[in-house]
A protein has these predicted regions:
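A structural motif corresponding to the C-terminal end of an alpha-helix
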Residues: 37-43, 74-83, 183-191, 231-236, ...
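Hydrophobic faces of well-ordered beta-strands that scaffold small-molecule active sites
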Residues: 5-9, 45-47, 84-87, 112-114, ...
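Catalytic metal-binding/acid-base residues of hydrolase active sites
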Residues: 10, 117, 147-148, 199, ...
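Active-site gating loops and adjacent loop-to-helix segments of metal-dependent hydrolytic enzymes
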Residues: 10-28, 150-172, 211-235
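Active-site-adjacent C-terminal substructures of enzyme catalytic domains
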Residues: 169-171, 188-190, 221-272
Length: 304
């Protein structure tokens, strides 16, 4: 059984889960999480915020941060050799970002857990510049997760199946595209961005990005990005987010090399961890490349 580090899993403290519409059941069972980790050879897991509606019922993002970040830090301290904590920010109060970032450091949280968008505001918005400056300065990775609250296209689809299946992956691709077009990646070259779900539809439109950019650039219809879009994508990291599709993995490898793909279970949304592991085990990759995806890439991001 390979050594595995899980870069994408979830735990919602009961104090938060009780204020959500969806996450009340199965999202607060840390013992179940540990059992599945042991059964599947997962040494450590990163705990990320799944995005929820808790901030609405709890009276705002700051109150959510007060509870969530503290409770995640307690789990990390209790199981310090098994879990790595990701902290969240009061996105509706950017004036509090600096204070909350310092609090995250003081609590021992090692990763910034952000969403692709917040009520239509993407991470290319200037309010996030101080966050990325902090991440670049401290080396804290930024994990970017799907947004369940009003993702792209929500006003058109409004469907309990189509929203998580289609809108989530379109939202991440829109986020990456907007960050590229706004110059966010150029402005913050030292930030280690990790995007969930292979970057959404990005692997499928990589060639279209380059070809269309080159065509439009010749006619001066698009600004000079200094390099093809695919060159930006090579510097990003993508986690597999519980995917059991070998085709998706191979498609992602056309965008980035194995050194930029991370194992991620997306537990408890996905509980068949063995099937996820089998996809990487069965891929036409070298033993070293498989080990990189399973375990060796992530410690380099965190200096573990």
């Amino acid at each position: 059984m390979p050594k595995i580090l899980d870069s994408h899993s979830h735990y919602l403290p009961p104090e938060v889960a009780q204020h959500t519409a969806f996450f009340k059941v199965n999202w607060s069972d840390i013992e179940r999480h540990l059992t599945l980790m042991d059964q599947n050879g997962i040494e450590r897991s990163v705990l990320l915020y799944p995005t929820s509606d808790a901030h609405i019922q709890m009276g705002g993002w700051q109150k959510l941060c007060d509870v969530y970040n503290l409770e995640i830090s307690k789990i990390v301290k209790k199981y310090h050799d098994r879990f790595i904590g990701g902290g969240i920010l009061p996105v509706d109060q950017p004036q509090n970002f600096k204070k909350e970032l310092q609090r995250m450091e003081d609590l021992g949280l090692r990763i910034l857990s952000l969403a692709y968008s917040y009520e239509g505001k993407y991470l290319d918005d200037p309010i996030f510049d101080p966050v990325f400056e902090f991440a670049g300065r401290t080396g804290m990775p930024v994990h970017v997760h799907p947004q369940i609250m009003n993702p792209i296209g929500e006003e058109r689809l409004r469907d309990p199946l189509l929203t998580p299946v289609l809108e989530y992956v379109f939202d991440v691709s829109a986020c990456i595209g907007k960050m590229m077009m706004s110059g966010t990646f150029l402005k913050h070259p030292d930030v280690k961005f990790i995007f969930a779900h292979y970057g959404g539809v990005l692997p499928f439109v990589k060639e279209r990005f380059d070809n269309t950019y080159q065509m439009l650039r010749k006619r001066n219809f698009v600004k000079d990005l200094t390099k093809d879009p695919s060159e930006y994508f090579k510097n990003l990291y993508f986690d597999i987010s519980g995917s059991k599709s070998a085709a998706s993995l191979m498609c992602a490898l056309e965008v980035v090399d194995p050194g930029h793909i991370l194992f991620g279970s997306d537990f408890p949304a996905n509980q068949n961890l063995a099937a996820i592991i089998a996809v990487i085990d069965g891929a036409p990759l070298s033993a070293a490349e498989k080990s990189a995806i399973f375990a060796n890439n992530f410690p380099q991001l965190l200096a573990l």
